[in-house]
Amino acid sequence: MALEAGYDYLHVAVVQCTPTQAAAVLGVLLLLAIRLAAAARSSSATSPKWKQHRLPPTPPGKLPIIGHLHLIGSHPHVSFRDLHAKYGHNGLMLVQVGAVPTIVVSTPQAAEAVLRTHDHVLASRPRNPVADIIRYNSTDVAFAPYGVYWRTARKVVNTHLLSAKMVFSKRREREEEVRLVVARIRDAAEASPGTALDMTELLGGYASDFVCRAVLGESHRKQGRNKLFRELTETSAALLGGFNVEDYFPKLADVDLFLRIICAKAKSVSKRWDSLFNELLSEYALSGGKQGDHNSEDFVHLLLSLQKDYGLTTDNIKGILVNMFEAAIETSFLVLEYSMSELMNNRHVLAKLQKEVRTATPDGRMVMEEDLSRMPYLKATIKESMRIHPPAPFLLPHFSTHDCEINGYTIPAGTRVIVNAWALARDPTCWDKAEEFFPERFLEQGRDAEVDMYGKDIRFVPFGAGRRICAGATFAIATVEIMLANLIYHFDWEMPAEMERTGAKVDMSDQFGMTLRRTQKLYLVPRIPKCVSSS
């Protein structure tokens, strides 16, 4: 449970320190109890400020200090879906998460109101101390509060870094990185037929290598930078998506020693990010800031060349870059891994997809990006993977800047609002076979053929919708499509021998965080089919 995770964190803080530090921590814990009680009283949805409004229904069983935390299991997206089914109304439910009243949105109609109708009121973000540290005072596009700076940063990213033109211009780099992975798999399959490969490592490495190449240019493998950036990205994502006590008890931010203990790991990671970025910026300065063809510029050089035009500070640029690494690598990797996992558990889908890809691709070469337009089932498979396994179960929290009314209930100013994207995509009132992996739903003759995953259809919002929609959606999908198509084209895939013998399925268990990661690594056996020539 989330609460247990918090207790575990405090236990580690006390145990892994010197006696003097332990005494200080214990003193802080005593102060913590007092602060928590005060925070719960001042921020509770039962306070006078909240009582004057007609609020969404709330589950029974709220406890002092912790609120409804004890009702939230290890998979909060599932807990909130189930709690809403019992106690929510019109897509809304109010839960007290520690000292923080939080509105949970669980139906498309309510999500439409939050992400579109009242988007101007709900487009901001609640303060996140960990993001403030890792994302340079939250000056990235994802965590920055809604306002002048966010609009400027968003314009820079949309217009210059992740525009359709820029995504298209990176096709050569994508295809080259895919070619390297295919060659690596082919070499392994020829050297040791029947040996299972660590697909989690291969797919994560591909996503990291391509994103690093787009951001850093040809220097992305210098001194193992691609691996270091991947490590930092995974660590940062774990910190941002973990149980951070100060998120649920904001008054603890006033306790300096406690905040230092909680944020120590984030500060350590931030220093490593900063060291890398300073090294990159120094190299740029030594090179005189020259980068050749404008259309092939990496994101670091582009941002630095735009710095004066948009009034960006060096920390602003660093914050945007951290966001680029974390969002692009994590999303692309997870979609690829979940897609391959589902294909192995649904061999009829794999066979159908393989037939499409091999028919659409001329023999003797790799799948190229121009071939993808002839692969509707590939696109449907990726969409279905993202429907049933959205990379982020919750959209990043929204924050109301003014009172607004949704479905007859008031959302007071200063309220945290969470959209349960996982619940929307599995809502049985909106989807046939909601719990099944069924790509055919998105084909031309399917019921959901017109469903869009870029924010137009509110039932399916893996990238969000409205003002805060993810700017990197097309970048991520382009990264996924070309890799998945080539994996399916070049190889026949099997489970490890024992799993094939027993008919075992890939374990789809996942672990909650800012993203949903599978708990087990994916191991698969590649076979080189006779019908596909080496390319």
Swiss-Prot record:
It is a multi-pass membrane protein. The keyword Hydrolase does not apply. SUPFAM superfamilies: Cytochrome P450. Pfam families: p450. Pathway: Secondary metabolite biosynthesis; 2,4-dihydroxy-1,4-benzoxazin-3-one biosynthesis; 2,4-dihydroxy-1,4-benzoxazin-3-one from indoleglycerol phosphate: step 4/5. The keyword Signal does not apply. It is an enzyme of class 1 (oxidoreductase). The chain crosses the membrane at residues 14-34, 469-489. Its EC number is 1.14.14.109. GO terms for molecular function: 3-hydroxyindolin-2-one monooxygenase activity; heme binding; iron ion binding; oxidoreductase activity, acting on paired donors, with incorporation or reduction of molecular oxygen, NAD(P)H as one donor, and incorporation of one atom of oxygen. It is found in: Membrane. One of its GO terms (cellular component) is membrane. InterPro entries: Cyt_P450, Cyt_P450_CS, Cyt_P450_E_grp-I, Cyt_P450_sf. Heme binds at residue 470. Its cofactor is heme. It catalyses: 3-hydroxyindolin-2-one + reduced [NADPH--hemoprotein reductase] + O2 = 2-hydroxy-2H-1,4-benzoxazin-3(4H)-one + oxidized [NADPH--hemoprotein reductase] + H2O + H(+). Keywords: Heme, Iron, Membrane, Metal-binding, Monooxygenase, NAD, Oxidoreductase, Transmembrane, Transmembrane helix. Catalyzes the conversion of 3-hydroxyindolin-2-one to 2-hydroxy-1,4-benzoxazin-3-one (HBOA). This is 3-hydroxyindolin-2-one monooxygenase. It comes from Zea mays (Maize). The gene is CYP71C1.
